[in-house]
Swiss-Prot record:
Stored HAMAP family: Cytidyl_kinase_type1 (MF_00238)
Enzyme class of the recorded protein, top EC level: transferase
Organism: Clostridium tetani (strain Massachusetts / E88)
Protein name (record): Cytidylate kinase
Compartments, record wording: Cytoplasm
Reaction(s) catalysed by this chain's protein: CMP + ATP = CDP + ADP; dCMP + ATP = dCDP + ADP
Amino acid sequence: MRVLVAIDGPAGAGKSTIAKLVAKKFNLMYIDTGAMYRAITYLAQNKNITPSNVEGLCNLINSISMYFKDDKIIVNGEDLSEEIRKPNVSSNVSLYASVLEVRTLLVDIQKDLACKYEVVMDGRDIGTVVMPHAPFKFFLTATPEIRADRRYKELKEKSQKVEYKNILEEIIKRDYIDSNRKVSPLKKAKDAIEIDTTNYHIEEVVDKISKLIESTIIKEKGRITK
């Protein structure tokens, strides 16, 4: 049994933090697909490539080297992990991620990684598009207010000047765009386990997911040895 874990959910639901910890626990590769879209957004903005410039975006994606190392995203040899979390990227990433050609190119890369490695992958369309046959699918949720508060605290810890009100408005806007886009909209896979993280600590969610994965692996091993 290949261990492929899909973790989907809206911004601020705790996907990345939880996915990293689950990947570490099971010694799996962690793929932050959101970081990939953020990286493209960051690079496109720096080159003045708008979301409507499809050809420019495709040329950009095809011209770069992108990989993950120690939970960091490296693009053309440069660590962009901090740059892609800044407000100007966060407020525009959904617009770039909604471009069909952008999603097609990045989804192909993500699918290729899932074929080559056992992975924990988080995003918005992992269980529905990227890894529809993954044996482990989870959909994390939380109230917009809680998600905004988490993002606010995260950015404040990085000494970024942010306002809670602006973050909440941005999250509500992103929820709408992500859920209503024509290409790979944010939605729960039919066979995904939904976990509301509003009143749970990160460690509790990781423990819940880990136990579900472990129990399935044990059952599968028992079935094979019979």
